[in-house]
Structure formats: C-alpha cells, structure tokens
UniProtKB/Swiss-Prot annotation:
Major structural core protein; binds to structural protein VP3. Constitutes the surface of the AHSV core. The gene is Segment-7. InterPro entries: Capsid_hemagglutn (IPR008980), Orbi_VP7_capsid (IPR001803), Orbi_VP7_capsid_C (IPR023178), Orbi_VP7_capsid_N (IPR023176), Virus_capsid_a-hlx_vir (IPR008935). It is found in: Virion. Belongs to the orbivirus VP7 family. It comes from African horse sickness virus (AHSV). This is Core protein VP7. Glycans are attached at N45. One of its GO terms (molecular function) is host cell surface receptor binding.
Amino acid sequence: MDAIAARALSVVRACVTVTDARVSLDPGVMETLGIAINRYNGLTNHSVSMRPQTQAERNEMFFMCTDMVLAALNVQIGNISPDYDQALATVGALATTEIPYNVQAMNDIVRITGQMQTFGPSKVQTGPYAGAVEVQQSGRYYVPQGRTRGGYINSNIAEVCMDAGAAGQVNALLAPRRGDAVMIYFVWRPLRIFCDPQGASLESAPGTFVTVDGVNVAAGDVVAWNTIAPVNVGNPGARRSILQFEVLWYTSLDRSLDTVPELAPTLTRCYAYVSPTWHALRAVIFQQMNMQPINPPIFPPTERNEIVAYLLLVASLADVYAALRPDFRMNGVVAPVGQINRALVLAAYH
C-alpha cells in the first residue's frame, strides 16, 4: 500500500513540473513520467502526453493524476462529469514495479504510516478545559460548602477559592477534561483583588502557596506537571484568597496537527478555493471517504488514509490543478460570472 501511494505521489508531483515547454525536465521526472504515462496509456486507452501544450493535453494529464489519486486512495467517485470517466484500471499501472518513486515521496508515506502505528506526545490545539460544561466569573469568591472550591473560567484558566487557613489538592481540577494528557505546562498566581459573594472588594491573604509533588513552586514560574504528581494549594493567612491557574499548553497522546510535518498548511491547501470545478471535485473525493468536504475538520485527522489524502494526494492534486489549469465540466457546477472574489468564495463555503 505504501508503494502504491508513493508512486502516485511521485507521478502527481512530477506532473507539476512539465507545464513549461522551454524548461529541460529533471532526469528523474522524465524517467517517472515516461514509464507511468506509458503504463497508464496502455491500460486505459488514453493518450497522455509528457509535455502537454494544448488545453486537451493538459486536461488528459490532469485526469491521469486524478485517476492515480483515486486509485491510491481506493475511491470510486462514479459519474461526476461529462468530460471525465474514472479509469479503474489505473491501479494496475500503480501496482507495477517498473514505475519508480522518488525518495521524498516514499519518506513522506512511510513517516505517515509509522506515526499512525504508534503514539507520542504532541501539543494540543484546544484548551484543556474546552470540554467543561460550565464556567464561573473570574475573581468572584464562591465556596458554598467546605473550605475550598475550584471552577473553570474559560478553556485555559481555572481558579481555586479558599477560606482562611484552608488547604487542598487540585489534581482533578487541573487535569484536562478529555484525552490522554502527558504533560501540562501552567503558571499560578494569587488574585490580588477579588469580590466576595456580596460584591465587596477583598485582598488575598499573603503567603498562599502551591506545591507540586511536595516542592514549592513560585507564582509566575512555568510548571511542567505530569498530571500524576499531587498538586496542593494552601492559604495559611487569616483572609480568604483566590488562586488562578493558567495552562499555557499541554501535550497529549491524541493526534494533532503536529503528528506529521506540514499537516496544518496542507489542510489549508486542500480546502483552498481554486475554482468552482476544483471545489466540487475535492468535495466529491472527500465525501466518498467520509471526510469533511468543504471546510476543514474540527479535530485533526486520526487515520492513516485521512492523512495520506490530506497531506499528500489531494494537496498535490491541487498543485497539479493550479499548474495545468484544466478546463472541464462538473455535474451541477455553474461557472461564475465575472472574476472570482472574496464574496463569491465566502458563499461557496457557506
């Protein structure tokens, strides 16, 4: 499977470089395209040219790239255009060992496969408390029972209200609401001025403290917490106090936009509006894979096939589309009148 994806990626990337007839082709590009086009033409009865010049020739090369992307992703899209029919025999061309793949293409595919077979800490994009079902007003003292109470202010900040002389552990409060957190990096600070339940202004008592695994940590210092070591708070003073905890970032075993290199910019490229035709084609491919067709997903992709589709094949196909400038019709797509502008693009995403 890796070899087929790497061959498809190599061919698609090579096709980006052939649009200028005045430029001498790289020997590796000539070898890759020479063999790939010969195998593809033989199996599909197409007539793709290595140096496309006319509109029809550019269309043919783009259709070949589309066929190879769909074959590598194991996707059948059906009748989507009066000008294009998917050549299902393309997988036979990609399966042949004669088509070389370049080193970068195979490295990209192998890295994706390897990363998705294991787990490692990566920075999470959303706040640790995004899953909290309620929040409270910052700086408002509220301890309805007991001597301490913690609550969330927003997706990154929690506060602990403490009576005079109170102490307690806040592990459950500080731990993220979802996912397998590895390390949390936070700072804590006492709220100098806050309000009691009646709205009167109060000043936190001096001497409030936070310990992590029994070690005092200074206010304002970045603390690296493994979510296991006990985090204790104390207010030895004679007045009520509020401590604020701000999570700067945290790592988790969940997939993130850093799981593989350049995933975030490639998602942007995948979902960029190139033309109405490309917008529709990309949507059809993603719909067949049960992926978000128009807008990027809320959470980073978690499956190998999704990342291959995003990071390599569909983004590379967008580059080929921009380079070859194919002109073909998509069922149900009406060409816009006038120049593409922000308003038209915004309407396409809505």
